[in-house]
A protein has these predicted regions:
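Bacterial Sec-dependent N-terminal signal peptides
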Residues: 1-25
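Histidine-acidic metal/acid-base catalytic patches
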Residues: 18-34, 38-56, 92, 108, ...
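Active-site-proximal loop/turn and secondary-structure-junction residues that shape catalytic pockets
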Residues: 36, 61-63, 103-106, 132-134, ...
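The substrate-binding groove and active-site-proximal loops of carbohydrate-active enzymes
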Residues: 36, 73, 101, 124, ...
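Glycine-rich, proline-tolerant flexible connector loops at the mouths of alpha/beta enzymes
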Residues: 59-84
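A short acidic, helix-capping loop that chelates divalent metal ions and anchors anionic groups
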Residues: 65-72, 151, 158, 189, ...
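Metal-dependent catalytic neighborhoods of phosphoester/phosphodiester hydrolases
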Residues: 68-72, 108-112, 260-261
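Active-site acidic/histidine proton-transfer and metal-coordination neighborhood
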Residues: 83, 93-179, 188-191
Length: 274
């Protein structure tokens, strides 16, 4: 950990001491999916991300809480002591749990426990890829706890059809509290035009995993800093602005790269300046 912070500090100095400047765009809410730093504990992750001026983080279920609590994962099974420790970490680093996922309830009991868990942290958005027969259950508890449930999708496969914008859009018409969670990277990996997906879900987007890639349709593609790939991120931002989207723009890296922390900070800068 002692080796990471000086590197981040140096990079911040190189960029002008902060990710903010006079050209920043203040209306975008920017978060980082903590899976991007899955090799670290959540405590370390929050310390790394704190200087970047984020609005929050999207926590994923299986990350270890702290080296001092190696058996604690970010799940509803956390004890009160563990939860209090995490709440103190959020306060210390001036961050919050903006969203939680990707998670699977698996049953009504599981859905209820997840909703109770995130509400305890003041989180308002759950990201799930649960099976379709559980969507009415998610709607029930989202209404009870004042949450938005955003349906995620991975690459095009046989698990579900959530990657199909027209199909998901039709499903979402049945629910008030359930929306879509477009993952720009997974759409590109599947050869699905991200802009089409965003337009098809217009007004029904609860969260976005915002990414860029060096090639479109490459199933083995990797993320690159926003604005440095071939995806038209600026046009997608304009489309989301047109829709009046007010949710989080969640930065996520799913592969380990040597420049990971620097790349994440570049993504934050891009979202602040465009």
């Amino acid at each position: 950990m002692r080796r990471i912070i000086p590197i981040l500090t140096f990079f911040s100095l190189l960029c002008g001491c902060s990710v903010f400047n006079s050209e920043t765009v203040s209306h975008r809410k920017v978060a980082v999916q903590t899976y991007s730093l899955h090799k670290y504990t959540l405590e370390q992750t929050l310390e790394i991300l704190a200087p970047m001026g984020l609005d929050g983080v999207e926590c994923y279920p299986e990350q270890i809480l702290s080296k001092s609590m190696p058996d604690a994962r970010i799940t509803p099974s956390m004890t009160k002591q563990q939860r209090d420790y995490l709440k103190a970490l959020f306060k210390k680093n001036n961050l919050k749990m903006a969203s939680y996922g990707v998670c699977f309830g698996g049953s009504e009991k599981g859905v209820r426990e997840i909703c109770e868990f995130v509400k305890d942290f003041g989180c308002e958005n759950v990201i799930t890829e649960d099976r379709e027969d559980l969507l009415p259950v998610w709607e029930k508890y989202a209404e009870k706890y004042g949450l938005t449930v955003s349906i995620h999708h991975h690459k095009k496969d046989n698990r579900n059809r959530y990657y199909d914008a027209d199909y998901l859009s039709e499903k979402l018409k049945n629910y008030k509290h359930i929306k879509g969670n477009p993952d720009i990277g997974h759409l590109s990996l599947s050869g699905i035009e991200p802009m089409y997906y965003l337009k098809a879900l217009s007004g029904r987007i609860g969260s976005v995993h915002f990414k860029d890639q060096p090639q479109f349709g490459d199933p083995n593609g990797r993320c690159v800093p926003l604005g440095e790939g071939i995806l038209d991120n600026k046009a997608m931002l304009a489309e989301l602005d047109r829709q009046g989207y007010e949710g989080y723009y969640v930065i996520e890296y799913e592969e380990d790269v040597p420049s990971l922390i620097e790349d994440i900070q570049k993504c934050v800068m891009f979202l602040r300046q465009n």
